[in-house]
């Protein structure tokens, strides 16, 4: 497993190897404001996200985080290594929320390089990643695949 040193010059298309696993350097603690704000803005009316009184008697014992925030945070944590030289996000697939996330949890992300293919343009290639999110207890909370169009060093890198 390669441990990230945050951003650098080693995330062009040519630098990724199929089968490689990246442990991203940063973690992110989920703040209540982040969860509540986006739940309200998206008109998500599921009480599990905003009714603390109701959720105290639930199997989880407290409010649940909105899955969209979990997905965004995990992909954001991976972006330092997987999108620094991205030209375009091409798609997400097989998104799975594996366990609940609560306010105060801290998320970490790992990524695996699943596939590399040529793009229709000569200055970039397509990399398919599988991202994994875990919480502070190393519990698997998220996984999903992502396709990214990434610059080729041969066209964009230092000469």
Task: Give the ranges of each region predicted by the language model.
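HotDog/MaoC-like acyl-thioester-processing domains
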Residues: 2-17, 101-106, 110-159
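Short, charged beta-turn/beta-strand-edge "cap" motif at the junction between a beta-strand
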Residues: 28-30, 96, 113-117
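Short, intrinsically disordered/low-complexity patches at protein termini
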Residues: 46-48, 89, 94-95, 127, ...
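Mid-chain, well-packed structural core segment of small domains
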Residues: 85-90, 95-103
